[in-house]
């Protein structure tokens, strides 16, 4: 049994510092690097790509809405063409640094409000996936496990990684409970580990109302921007390995 561990990194910019990138990088196999629109800047992008290379971690682009002040967590209405070209632009920006460091770009994972909007808006999802395909159809599109965007990508011939979230509560329909609601973010490392094992070995997890939600798991998102991020990441990796699960980059799972 194999699974990838990913985290959103490179989200500092200018004088502002966010996340514990150097420490979290030790426990993951894929890094989602911010591409400058919701967070990140050229210096941070280069530094993060280099850090991933040094740690043997695969690199992916983490594009979002053009919303630096809102950290990409505010919804924006985009046309198909806007979505397609916004993604192409941001992926291309990160690829410049990936190429400069002599490594490969593995995947694309949309950020924040854009990630969530794809699940509800098929035209938006098609635009985003087309933008990925415009750049390189061999890139892996990371999206919410079992969601409509995953189906669309498969229909379009784009590789897909089904993603689950270690520290987020689920609705019965498999979507994430909004951060604004009580219980949306889980902070206890033992509870998080139990849920991750359930997802990987049992193929699902209990929703916030107690119902069972089936989930396909290719990659698990570990958030790197909370105070306990390093402790949680280390614990999850340890528990998975003790259960006999191999932790590998998603390119070794999605072929």
From Swiss-Prot:
UniProt keyword list: ATP-binding, Hydrolase, Nucleotide-binding
Biological process according to GO: carbohydrate metabolic process
Organism whose genome encodes this protein: Thermococcus kodakarensis (strain ATCC BAA-918 / JCM 12380 / KOD1) (Pyrococcus kodakaraensis (strain KOD1))
Domain of life from the UniProt record: Archaea
Protein name: 5-oxoprolinase subunit A
Purpose of the protein: Catalyzes the cleavage of 5-oxoproline to form L-glutamate coupled to the hydrolysis of ATP to ADP and inorganic phosphate.
CDD domains: LamB_YcsF_like (cd10787)
A Pfam family this chain is assigned to: LamB_YcsF
Catalytic activity, EC: 3.5.2.9
GO molecular function term, any single one: ATP binding
Family named by the database record: Belongs to the LamB/PxpA family.
Summary of subunit composition and partner proteins: Forms a complex composed of PxpA, PxpB and PxpC.
InterPro entries per UniProt: Glyco_hydro/deAcase_b/a-brl, LamB/YcsF/PxpA-like
Record SUPFAM superfamilies: Glycoside hydrolase/deacetylase
The keyword ATP-binding is annotated on this UniProt entry: yes
Catalytic activity, as annotated: 5-oxo-L-proline + ATP + 2 H2O = L-glutamate + ADP + phosphate + H(+)
């Amino acid at each position: 049994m194999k699974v990838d561990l990913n985290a959103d990194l490179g989200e500092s910019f200018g004088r502002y510092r966010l996340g514990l990138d150097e420490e979290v990088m030790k426990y993951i196999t894929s890094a989602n690097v911010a591409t400058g629109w919701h967070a990140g800047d050229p210096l941070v992008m280069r530094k993060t790509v280099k850090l991933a290379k040094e740690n043997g971690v695969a690199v992916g682009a983490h594009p979002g809405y053009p919303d630096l002040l809102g950290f990409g967590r505010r919804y924006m209405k985009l046309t198909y063409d806007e979505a397609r070209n916004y993604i192409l632009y941001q992926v291309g920006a990160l690829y410049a640094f990936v190429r400069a460091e002599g490594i490969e770009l593995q995947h694309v994972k949309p950020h924040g409000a854009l990630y969530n909007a794809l699940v509800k808006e098929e035209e938006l999802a098609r635009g985003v996936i087309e933008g990925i395909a415009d750049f390189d159809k061999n890139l892996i599109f990371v999206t919410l496990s079992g969601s409509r965007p995953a189906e669309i990508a498969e229909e379009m011939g784009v590789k897909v990684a089904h993603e689950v979230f270690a520290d987020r509560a689920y609705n019965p329909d498999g979507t994430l409970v909004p951060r604004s609601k009580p219980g949306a973010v889980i902070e206890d490392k033992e509870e998080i580990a139990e849920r991750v094992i359930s997802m990987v070995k049992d193929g699902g997890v209990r929703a916030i109302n107690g119902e069972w939600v089936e989930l396909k798991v290719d990659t698990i998102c570990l958030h790197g921007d909370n105070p306990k991020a390093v402790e949680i990441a280390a614990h999850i990796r340890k528990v998975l390995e003790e259960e006999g699960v191999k932790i590998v980059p998603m390119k070794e799972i999605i072929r």
